[in-house]
Amino acid sequence: LETIEQVKEAVGDDTAIACCVSAMEVGRSMQFFGARVNLAKTLLYAINGGRDEMSGDQVGPAYRPVTGDVLDYEDVMAKFDDMMQWLARTYVHAMNCIHYSHDRYNYERLMMALHDRDILRTMAFGIAGLSVVADSLSAIKYAKVHVIRDDKGLAVDYRIESKGTPPQFGNNDDRVDTIAADLVTSFMQKIRKHPTYRNATHTQSVLTITSNVVYGKMTGNTPDGRRKGGPFGPGANPMHGRDSHGWLASCLSVARLPYDE
């Protein structure tokens, strides 16, 4: 959750919300929009060594997949980190190509005429599926998650073995809220390693608008128990129905996400 104090500290008091959530100085800054990446599918790619869990195609790099029948937290995190490194590099490169081409063939002259000559350019990256990934990693860490494979050895489903419900994002529980916050920081650090078009400043949002439905439709079963094709929680929200401790606990979980990242 953003506060006026956070916004003023970051960009000053002469600000407006551009696009959906980005605070920017009016007339002094602009944004190269960047949509978002599907972090939940990235986790599944990490488990399957870059193969798509729905089509079986080799989409990501052919890293070593998880081979055990039970997901090990440290093993999954190491593979997930490698896959996020690849994703961040691919994401920034794609954004640079898009906005170079956009400026070349459809430069927004009228809107730029209303800005200062020397402006701050930002490039807006984003994450979708944060609560799905946080809950999945929480289940792997605090319960036992069994892998179910198809006849080709592809991990296509998961079974959680637990005496109770593993910690779930949205309930003011440090065990899972910390995982979510660390993911935001970690992915942003990876994004910042890669230079941007026109030296734009890297920014990141945990925003989906309505793409949480579309992204979920294209994502298979996840280790948190979410079913294939099911929508993600919108934006930085908990997954549907998992915030069982009231709205304040849900807000406190979201507020743990670092605004500076």
Task: Locate predicted features.
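Conserved catalytic cores of very large enzyme subunits
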Residues: L1-E261
